[in-house]
Amino acid sequence: MTENEPSLVDSGEFTVRRTITIAASIEKVWAAITEATHVARWFGRSAVLDTVTVGSVGIFSFDGHGDFPVRIEECDPPRTIASRWGDGDPHAVDPLDPDRSTVFRFVLDVVDGGTQFRVVESGFGGLSDPAASMESHRGGWDAELDELVAYLNGGS
């Protein structure tokens, strides 16, 4: 199994990014990142997604962090999906306001031995504390994507 590098913060671009390799087919990875029953096994505590089309909305829930509304912004099966999500501010009038939320974009590519998975999360510049948010999400992507790898490689 390939050892995957940790996430990187780019404070100049206000992004967090990570690239990993998963020993699974692109179809299996696509299902794991787009079907709510699979998503809930590796990404937070629970996931609710209406459908996987641009404009669809849902909620991702995380222990200790609460519920985060999401809206699909881009979808090109089985290669790319991007979703906007709120920053968890319980007082936000519109939690998916483009000026107060971030977008995470997953891109999949077939490689020898499986699938390359890239995530880039952008939009931190509009949040109340961009540096703290980027660092928090960096750690989150490290943990969650490690869970995705374990899940797709036969973990629980």
Regions found by a protein language model. Give the residues of each.
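Short, highly charged C-terminal tails/helix-capping segments
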Residues: 51, 150-156
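Short beta-edge strand/loop motif at the mouth of beta-sheet-based domains
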Residues: 11, 17-18, 37-71, 80
